[in-house]
A protein has these predicted regions:
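Short amphipathic alpha-helical segments at helix boundaries and their inter-helical linkers
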Residues: 36, 73-79, 100-115
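Gly/Ser/Thr-rich helix-start
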Residues: 19, 47, 66, 72, ...
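A short structural micro-motif
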Residues: 31-32, 68-69, 86, 99-106
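Mid-chain, well-packed structural core segment of small domains
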Residues: 61-64, 68-94
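Residues at alpha-helix boundaries and the short loops/turns that link adjacent helices
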Residues: 16-19, 73, 87, 103
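Acidic, glycine/proline-rich low-complexity segments that act as flexible tails and inter-domain linkers
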Residues: 1-57, 85, 110-126
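Short alpha-helical scaffolding segments that buttress acidic/His motifs in well-ordered protein cores
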Residues: 40-44, 61-68, 96-101, 112
Length: 126
């Protein structure tokens, strides 16, 4: 049986995050972690990321802001890369992180800037 929502999600996930990122995510899948990868691909990427209310660039920038607030650095790096893939500029990412400073606090924003700098190529420690 074909799962069209999963297939659409997988295509969207690859479009946003890149083929290599998705391949690495699935390379580490075990019987235990398979359900969460399927859930993410099917529901986040196959449903929410497919909705018409926001373009992909805006969705990516919103995701960067939320991951900054949550302090999820590993996920943040992937989604900064995704935002760039979706047409966001380095300046837009920088502004999202600076804006997050006001609402999330300086420590969270400093960590987010460090993670984002690794992706955008300005990786000197600050």
């Amino acid at each position: 049986m074909s799962d069209d929502q999963f297939e659409r999600g997988l295509a969207m996930r690859k479009q946003v995050m890149g083929e290599d990122f998705v391949a690495r995510a699935y390379a580490g899948v075990t019987d235990f972690t398979a359900p969460i990868q399927t859930h993410i691909t099917r529901n986040a990427w196959g449903d929410v990321w497919q909705r018409p209310g926001l373009d992909l660039q805006t969705r990516s920038l919103v995701t960067v802001a939320m991951l900054t607030a949550l302090g999820k650095q590993h996920e943040l790096e992937g989604h900064v890369r995704g935002a760039l893939n979706n047409g966001a500029t380095v300046q837009e990412i920088q502004e999202v992180l600076l804006h997050a400073t006001v609402y999330c606090g300086v420590p969270a924003a400093v960590e987010a800037f460090r993670s984002a700098a690794e992706v955008v190529g300005a990786g000197e420690a600050g």
